[in-house]
């Protein structure tokens, strides 16, 4: 038995069958029930021509079905593909096609979008619709109802042997603004991103230890606040399923701090996983409300992945949760979990500071690891258990996954310094990526959407500081002669091209866009305009 995620979670289910695994609204399922339903779904998929190596899209809100679909894919050596439910039709088509989806499990609400996209994806041959609180007609997408499909499957675990080399793909934003699929081997993902399935102990040396740990360790109840379509929440869920914990999912489509704190009290949540200030600030403010009477006594850890806390928000939360430990983790889709923040950040530190192991380094211009304490800025890199590359993108793979001086490194573009004590200070992305509430937004895609408006001659998009979201999207626009452009008009137009969180919240009109001699936008100039000019502004991400 290798370190395969399906094998490991099945072994945990056998070790603690009657233990609750997932809570979602009024639905509570044990490990045995979760495994049985995933097994039934896996057999249904096999019976309908979906099997080893096929890609299964999960176009779902947070739900038990999301986890069932993930586990079912693992069982048959297929690959679950996360789909951002905020995508509009053009973005969905790109992802469906780029990911070579053979099947899609979607919420009923999304049937019209699936109907619009599916005919343009030649290899897509199975659609399953999960019931929700809408009355959308699933016949428009020719989808099969999910529950009868699951019920029809066998409960036998008579699947083909699996491998630690089975594939897991996580789609994330690309440098051109389009999503790209990060390919991980199961075994590498387990140790690089999922803490070996033992978040508060040593990683396992044998596969059997995962179930042993799950049975013997204390049960930890975890609440991943972010959507499961994001790696931060998906990995949190897998970590605690592997460790025999209990996962609490929020049963709403929108971020609701009041509901989250009520769930914390009702389910005695121990660990909360969030995405930086975008979630941390509203959660802190909810606790600070006059008359707030939430029971947070069970919480002993609050973690942030995908975006770090600011010191101010961390202090707000600490004041309300004095007995909790606050953990920023750094890494990402390409790097996994590379380290955790130091307890106290020095006041003069130019960025958040983290502890890391020997697999993480800061590389100089010659791609050699910098020694501690030089004060030099370099590229954050990781070696060892890292992804295979990007799916169907050898060019970007070659740029991000590099061979240098006998080592293979993943270099995602973060700039950093290695301090005298060996800790890592993160300085930010070397690219122009905008991080709004943990969502990666790439200017080129939004610029293309803006330029497709009849009144826009040219446009540059940058991120500007935002107290809640970390950054918000600002557009610097040159209108066509005789034309005018308003924020409201561009907002409505962009929403037909890109997801809502990518739409500019500020508009700065200029006589002419400044570009470099190469023709590339001058982002430094654009940031100065966006930071110094009066803005027509809207809300956050």
Predicted regions and their residues:
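Conserved AMP-binding/adenylate-forming core of the ANL superfamily
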Residues: 10, 18-63, 67, 71, ...
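Conserved pre-ATP/AMP-binding loop-to-beta segment of ANL
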Residues: 17, 152-171, 177-178, 212-221
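Conserved AMP-binding A3 loop
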Residues: 30-32, 167-195, 200-203
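Structural core segment of the AMP-binding/adenylate-forming
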Residues: 47-48, 75-148
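AMP-binding/adenylate-forming catalytic core of the ANL superfamily
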Residues: 87, 93-96, 104-106, 262-265, ...
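Gly/Ser/Thr-rich phosphate-binding loop
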Residues: 147, 174, 242-245, 269-274, ...
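Conserved AMP-binding/adenylation subdomain of ANL enzymes
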Residues: 190-224, 229-271
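Conserved ATP/PPi-binding loop(s) of AMP-dependent carboxylate-activating enzymes
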Residues: 355, 368-401, 439-441
């Amino acid at each position: 038995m290798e370190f395969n995620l399906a094998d490991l979670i099945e072994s945990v289910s056998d070790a603690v069958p009657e233990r609750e695994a997932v809570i979602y609204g009024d639905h509570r399922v044990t490990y045995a029930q979760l495994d049985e339903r995933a097994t039934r779904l896996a057999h249904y998929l096999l019976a309908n021509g979906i099997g080893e190596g096929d890609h299964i899209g999960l176009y779902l809100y947070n739900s038990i079905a999301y986890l069932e679909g993930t586990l079912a894919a693992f069982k048959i050596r297929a690959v679950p593909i996360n789909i951002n439910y905020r995508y509009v039709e053009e973005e969905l088509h790109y992802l469906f096609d780029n990911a070579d989806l053979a099947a899609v499990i979607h919420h009923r609400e999304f049937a019209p979008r699936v109907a619009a996209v599916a005919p343009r994806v030649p290899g897509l041959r199975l659609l399953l619709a999960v019931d929700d609180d809408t009355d959308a007609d699933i016949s428009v997408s020719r989808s099969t109802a999910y529950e009868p499909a699951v019920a029809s499957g066998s409960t036998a675990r008579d699947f083909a042997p699996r491998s630690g080399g089975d594939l897991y793909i996580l789609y994330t934003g690309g440098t051109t603004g389009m999503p790209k699929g990060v390919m991980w081997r199961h075994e590498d993902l387990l140790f690089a991103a999922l803490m070996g399935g033992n978040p508060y102990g040593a990683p396992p040396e044998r596969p059997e230890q995962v179930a042993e740990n799950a049975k013997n360790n204390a049960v930890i109840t975890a609440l991943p606040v972010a959507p499961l379509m994001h790696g931060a929440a998906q990995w949190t869920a897998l970590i605690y399923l592997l460790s025999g914990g209990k996962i609490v999912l929020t049963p709403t489509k929108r971020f609701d701090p009041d509901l989250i704190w009520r769930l914390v009290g009702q389910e005695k949540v121990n660990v909360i996983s969030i995405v930086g200030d975008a979630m941390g600030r509203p959660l802190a403010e909810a606790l600070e409300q006059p008359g707030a009477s939430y029971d947070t006594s069970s919480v002993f850890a609050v973690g942030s992945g995908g975006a770090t806390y600011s010191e101010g928000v961390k202090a707000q939360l600490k004041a309300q949760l004095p007995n909790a430990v606050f953990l920023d983790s750094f890494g990402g889709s390409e790097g996994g979990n590379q380290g955790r923040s130091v307890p106290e950040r020095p006041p003069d530190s130019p960025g958040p500071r983290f502890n890391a192991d020997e697999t993480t380094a800061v590389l100089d211009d010659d791609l050699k690891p910098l020694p501690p304490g030089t004060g030099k800025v370099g590229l954050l890199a990781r070696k060892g258990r890292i992804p295979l590359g990007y799916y169907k993108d050898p060019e970007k793979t070659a740029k991000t996954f590099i061979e240098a001086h006998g080592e293979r490194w993943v270099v995602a573009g973060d700039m950093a310094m290695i301090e005298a004590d060996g800790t890592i200070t993160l300085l930010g992305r070397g690219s122009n990526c905008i991080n709004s509430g943990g969502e990666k937004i790439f200017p080129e895609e939004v610029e293309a959407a803006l330029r497709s408006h009849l009144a826009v001659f040219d446009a540059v998009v940058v991120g500007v500081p935002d107290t809640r979201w970390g950054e918000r999207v600002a557009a610097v626009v040159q209108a066509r002669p005789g034309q005018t452009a308003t924020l409201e008009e561009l907002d409505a137009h962009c929403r037909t091209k890109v997801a809502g969180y990518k739409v500019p919240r500020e508009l700065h009109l200029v006589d002419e866009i400044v570009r470099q001699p190469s023709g590339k936008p001058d982002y430094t100039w654009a940031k100065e305009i966006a930071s110094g000019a009066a803005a027509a502004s809207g809300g956050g991400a």
